A protein has these predicted regions:
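Long, contiguous N-terminal structural blocks used for assembly/anchoring
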Residues: 1-70
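Intrinsically disordered, low-complexity, compositionally biased regions/tails
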Residues: 22, 38, 98-100, 131
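Amphipathic protein-protein interaction modules
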Residues: 54-125
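Long, highly charged low-complexity segments enriched in Glu/Asp and Lys/Arg with interspersed Ser/Thr
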Residues: 125-132
Length: 132
């Protein structure tokens, strides 16, 4: 049983890493000079890290069977890819679960991601990433 738990935690870690990477590189903010800045150039606050880990754990646990199906259904599709798609799909970017050729699995994951609601990173006054 401990081995299964270790595997599942490793899958969650991969999912979370993919989510954070996609959430940050796909997001921008406006600096004090009115210039657009890429979020991924900044360090994450504790709040951002906690928010991302909690959101990923909740989605991962609630949709684990479909995430497993997705990784088995499409060759080369990993938990990291699935985390990436969670970030893009929940924020309704132009790519995500729905365009992976995952059929019903993709539709269920898309609906679940949309139900999770959008979340947007921003840069705080301390130049750290926060999530609202």
């Amino acid at each position: 049983m401990a081995v299964q738990t270790d595997i599942r935690e490793a899958q969650l870690a991969q999912f979370t890493a993919g989510y954070i990477e996609a959430l940050y590189w796909s997001s921008t903010d406006i600096d004090e000079d009115g210039e657009t800045v890429n979020i991924d150039q900044f360090e994450a606050s504790t709040q951002a890290g906690d928010h991302c880990r909690a959101a990923c754990r909740e989605f991962f646990e609630a949709n684990y069977a479909d995430l497993i199906a997705a990784t088995e259904q499409q060759r080369g599709y990993s938990f990291e890819h699935a985390g990436h798609d969670f970030a893009l799909t929940r924020n309704r970017h132009g790519a995500g679960y729905w365009d992976r050729g995952l059929d019903d699995t993709g539709r269920r994951l898309t609906e679940a991601a949309h139900n999770a609601g959008e979340c947007w990173p921003y840069i705080g006054d301390d130049d750290l990433i926060y999530i609202h």
